[in-house]
Amino acid sequence: MTETPPGALPVPYVPGMSGLSVMARGGYATVYRATQDSVGRDVAIKVENRTLDNPRDQARFLREARAAGRMSSHPHVVDLFDVGVTVDQHPYLIMELCDGSYLDRMRVSPLDPVEARDVGIKIADALVHSHANGVLHRDVKPANILYSEFNAAVLADFGLAVLGEMRDSSVTLEVLTPAYAPPEMFRHDSPSGAADVYALCATLYAVMSGRPPRWESNRSPSILTLMDLFNHPIPELPGVPERLVAVLRYGMDNDPTARPTAEQLRDLLNNLHLDPSTPQPPPAVYRAPRPNHVPPPRPRPIPPSTPTLDETPTVHNNPDRKGFFQKWFFGG
């Protein structure tokens, strides 16, 4: 794989596209806004900074394209229109154009509980569809949940996705977004849908609090501190109903087999009425159907409301590089 500094990439030539202008640059890719000439449609083009020099890189790009294409029929997954490789061997994906991400939103103003719950229902439903089709996302985080004028939440970036026929666990610390990753991903356990559930619950917590679960400030903790944080209770959120926090704690249990499935999480959120003045019975938990190719975790009863123990993948080949940990932990 050959890396090209993002600022050094010239505007690429993509057949059938015109008016390319940079929307965002990162260590992993550059995203352009463009017009699809044949239909006059505005689109987003993600051009990776690397070139496809070896079979592993080619397989990873194909994995993302196949996973995104397989999922894009869902209303809350970003539409993928086409893929290809530029003349200088940079892979690209042509996708639905969105207005921004929930990482942008949470930096400006945290979401209220009702909006966060509604985003959770939509993305959990996308994960239900994904897991039922043998696709694990593995990088759910605020930067990968986008919004537009016509769609409040869509899941993007299947760059770390695992397909049912490719059950590898080749996610290294360099490509994790640790703020939203469950403890088993640091142990390189076999991929499962439980990791996506954890990441979604951590994301919903973050968009309401303005920072990831258990973090006391916006400063990035050391890796040792981060691992110790998994043993700390997840705090309450001021102004957020305890019942919503309890559901999120349930999804962020340190034991992946104790978390709800994506389907259970979706239904728990969907049945959660957030008027604090209205008494409610505990939400029911049931065992969701188990797809053959993606074994879901085993459910357990909903925990009490009291605390219990418990952005585009950022790829860096040189962890000692200045600024690595800040970008790595925040997923920006």
Residue ranges, per PLM feature:
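Protein kinase glycine-rich loop
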Residues: L20-G27, V31
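AlphaC helix of the eukaryotic protein kinase fold
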Residues: N49-R70
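Short beta-strand micro-motifs within the conserved protein kinase catalytic domain, predominantly
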Residues: D79-Q89
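Conserved short submotifs of the Hanks-type protein kinase catalytic core
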Residues: V87-S101, R105
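Activation segment signature within eukaryotic-like protein kinase domains
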Residues: V119-G120
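Protein kinase catalytic-loop region centered on the HRD/HxD motif
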Residues: I123-V135
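Short proline-rich PxxP-based motifs
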Residues: T225-G239
